[in-house]
C-alpha cells in the first residue's frame, strides 16, 4: 500500500462555458416583441423589417409576428418579422 497520496494534475481540468450563439427562432415561427431571434458575434445575419440589433449584435423582434429569413445584397442574409395578420 502506498503511504503517500498520489498527486493529481492541478493545472488542467477546466474549460470555459460555450457562448450559446446561433439562431434561436427559425423561419415561420411566431414571436412576441422582444424575443431573441439570433445570437451572434458580428453581423452574420443583418436586421430586416421590425428587427432590432443589440450592442452585442443580438437580433430581436420589435413587433409580434412571424419570422422570415431573406437573402439580399450579394449573399447577405437578413431576418425580418412580419405581423401575423399582414402575412395571411
UniProtKB/Swiss-Prot annotation:
Molecular function in Gene Ontology: structural constituent of ribosome
Keyword Ribonucleoprotein found: yes
Keyword Hydrolase: no
Keywords: Ribonucleoprotein, Ribosomal protein
Biological processes annotated in GO: translation
Protein family: Belongs to the bacterial ribosomal protein bL27 family.
NCBIfam families: L27
Official protein name in the record: Large ribosomal subunit protein bL27
Organism annotation: Picosynechococcus sp. (strain ATCC 27264 / PCC 7002 / PR-6) (Agmenellum quadruplicatum)
Record lineage: Bacteria, Bacillati, Cyanobacteriota, Cyanophyceae, Oscillatoriophycideae
Gene designation per UniProt: rpmA
Amino acid at each position: 500500500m502506498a503511504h503517500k497520496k498520489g498527486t493529481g494534475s492541478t493545472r488542467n481540468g477546466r474549460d470555459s462555458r460555450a457562448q450559446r450563439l446561433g439562431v434561436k427562432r427559425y423561419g415561420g415561427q411566431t414571436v412576441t416583441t422582444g424575443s431573441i431571434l439570433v445570437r451572434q458575434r458580428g453581423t452574420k445575419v443583418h436586421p430586416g423589417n421590425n428587427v432590432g440589433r443589440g450592442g452585442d449584435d443580438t437580433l430581436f423582434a420589435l413587433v409580434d409576428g412571424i419570422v422570415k429569413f431573406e437573402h439580399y445584397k450579394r449573399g447577405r442574409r437578413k431576418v425580418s418579422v412580419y405581423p401575423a395578420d399582414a402575412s395571411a
